């Protein structure tokens, strides 16, 4: 399923002045991403401001994207919450949408379950979904994270076939080595880890920076595929400071500000994330220019 799919973008959700989803702007962003090398999309993830989207908005957003993109675009719909019953419902409904390929489920945040609880949570989602499930391990936002042993256990489930891992390259390497399952794909969720994760056997990157640097990231994966390590290193060194700069302020505000510069979206987020103010935008521009 994930073979040769290296660059997946966690797509933003554009909003209009009425604080509604801006579908014409969304289509412009999708066109831009596909033209610059994105092979798949994560819908309504963290970058898509999932915490501020209603259940109805998430369904409508997923339905729109699934109907808009070419059928060979990999689509991963985010079903995850910190409520197992709600996550199961989301997974069932989202997995029924035509052209949705997989379901994303995040480590439960705030209520801080232990490993046994997280395994039960993900198992319930995978049991309910009509599409394969991608785990999302992000302890920096969830306050809890899956251990390698838990990932190995979950990878044995017939309907869990991937993970978005945001911890460390060492963690990624351990997951790849210990799952010993060629059908289980490990993606980094950290743009700056792209080269290192791939070297350790990672499938690719679920990216934020690809909104702005898709061509360069696509070229990086091309260089890696043909073993041109020198070119890959040059590209990663060029990209890493820019990737980090896009998180100098709460995401996705920096990416939205830069896409606004390209006349693709309004410079709008949903609270509690605020758009960059003038000083922040100036600082971001300087960071990106200096790097």
Curated annotation (Swiss-Prot):
Q: Which UniProt keywords apply?
A: Amino-acid biosynthesis, Cytoplasm, Diaminopimelate biosynthesis, Lyase, Lysine biosynthesis, Schiff base
Question: Which residues does UniProt mark as catalytic?
Answer: 136, 164
Q: Name the principal localization, coarsely classed.
A: cytoplasm
What protein family is recorded? Answer: Belongs to the DapA family.
Protein name per its UniProtKB record: 4-hydroxy-tetrahydrodipicolinate synthase
Q: How does it assemble?
A: Homotetramer; dimer of dimers.
Classification via SMART domains: DHDPS
Question: PROSITE patterns this protein is in?
Answer: DHDPS_1 (PS00665), DHDPS_2 (PS00666)
User: Top EC class per UniProt?
Assistant: lyase
Q: What is its EC number?
A: 4.3.3.7
The protein's role, per its UniProt record: Catalyzes the condensation of (S)-aspartate-beta-semialdehyde [(S)-ASA] and pyruvate to 4-hydroxy-tetrahydrodipicolinate (HTPA).
State which pathway it belongs to: Amino-acid biosynthesis; L-lysine biosynthesis via DAP pathway; (S)-tetrahydrodipicolinate from L-aspartate: step 3/4
Would I find Lyase among this entry's keywords?
A: yes
Q: Name one Pfam family in it.
A: DHDPS
Q: Which reaction does it catalyse?
A: L-aspartate 4-semialdehyde + pyruvate = (2S,4S)-4-hydroxy-2,3,4,5-tetrahydrodipicolinate + H2O + H(+)
Species per Swiss-Prot/TrEMBL record: Leuconostoc citreum (strain KM20)
Q: Subcellular location, in the record's words?
A: Cytoplasm
What CDD domains does this protein map onto?
DHDPS (cd00950)
UniProt-recorded Gene Ontology molecular function terms: 4-hydroxy-tetrahydrodipicolinate synthase activity
């Amino acid at each position: 399923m994930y073979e040769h799919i290296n660059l997946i973008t966690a797509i933003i959700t554009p909003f209009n002045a009425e604080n509604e989803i801006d579908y014409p702007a969304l289509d412009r962003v999708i066109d831009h991403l596909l033209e610059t090398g994105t092979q798949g999309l994560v819908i309504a993830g963290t970058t898509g401001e999932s915490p501020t989207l209603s259940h109805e908005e998430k369904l409508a957003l997923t339905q729109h994207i699934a109907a808009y993109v070419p059928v060979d675009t990999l689509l991963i719909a985010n079903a995850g919450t910190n409520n197992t019953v709600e996550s199961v419902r989301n997974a069932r409904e989202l997995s029924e949408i035509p052209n949705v390929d997989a379901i994303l489920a995040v480590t439960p945040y705030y209520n801080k379950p232990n490993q046994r609880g997280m395994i039960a949570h993900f198992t319930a989602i995978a049991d309910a979904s009509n599409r394969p499930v991608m785990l999302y391990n992000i302890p920096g936002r969830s306050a809890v994270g899956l251990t390698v042993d838990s990932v190995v256990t979950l990878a044995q489930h017939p309907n869990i076939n991937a993970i978005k891992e945001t911890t460390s390259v060492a963690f990624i390497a351990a997951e790849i080595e210990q799952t010993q399952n060629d059908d289980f794909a490990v993606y980094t969720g950290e743009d700056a880890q792209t080269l290192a994760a791939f070297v350790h056997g990672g499938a690719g990157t679920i990216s934020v920076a690809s909104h702005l640097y898709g061509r360069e990231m696509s070229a990086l994966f091309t260089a890696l595929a043909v073993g041109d390590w020198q070119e890959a290193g040059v590209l990663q060194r060029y990209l890493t400071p820019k990737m980090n700069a896009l998180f100098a302020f709460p995401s996705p505000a920096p990416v939205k500000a830069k896409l606004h510069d390209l006349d693709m979206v309004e410079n709008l987020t949903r609270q509690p994330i605020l758009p960059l103010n003038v000083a922040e935008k100036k600082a971001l521009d300087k960071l990106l220019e200096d790097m």
